[in-house]
């Protein structure tokens, strides 16, 4: 079961946001929340909010436990770029690019391992081996 949450037009460059999301991939949701609380990167606070939103979506919409969730995907794509200008010497102007990005988190529930049923061949082999060892 996949649960998604997204953050659009986040006012931070994609490069800076990728630094944090790269480390989150594959982590359990609880571990990732603890890590995000301790990191001092600028985007970690907003990614923590996004992670909490994704966990709330999973609990509310699909009745999943937070302990079973892990981060399957963390995508950061570039968004629109706001173009501003700064006055410079001799009447010139230089461009300032204020970059944005879109972040998408995908959580999945880890399936608990179920006891496998032995096939007939496996059970017959086990019986034969036990008979041989007894005689």
Where are the predicted features?
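Structured, basic alpha/beta domains of bacterial-type, RNA-associated proteins
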Residues: 1-125, 132
């Amino acid at each position: 079961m996949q649960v998604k949450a997204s953050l659009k037009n986040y006012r931070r460059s994609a490069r800076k946001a990728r630094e944090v999301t790269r480390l989150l991939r594959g982590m359990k949701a609880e571990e990732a929340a603890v890590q995000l609380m301790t990191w001092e990167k600028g985007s970690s606070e907003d990614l923590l909010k996004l992670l909490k939103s994704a966990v709330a979506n999973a609990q509310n919409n699909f009745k999943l436990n937070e302990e079973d969730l892990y981060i399957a995907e963390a995508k950061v794509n570039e968004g629109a770029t706001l173009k501003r200008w700064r006055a410079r010497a001799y009447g010139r102007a230089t461009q300032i690019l204020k970059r944005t990005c879109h972040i998408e988190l995908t959580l999945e529930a880890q399936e608990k391992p179920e006891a496998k049923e032995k096939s007939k061949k496996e059970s017959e082999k086990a019986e034969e081996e036990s008979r041989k060892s007894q005689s």
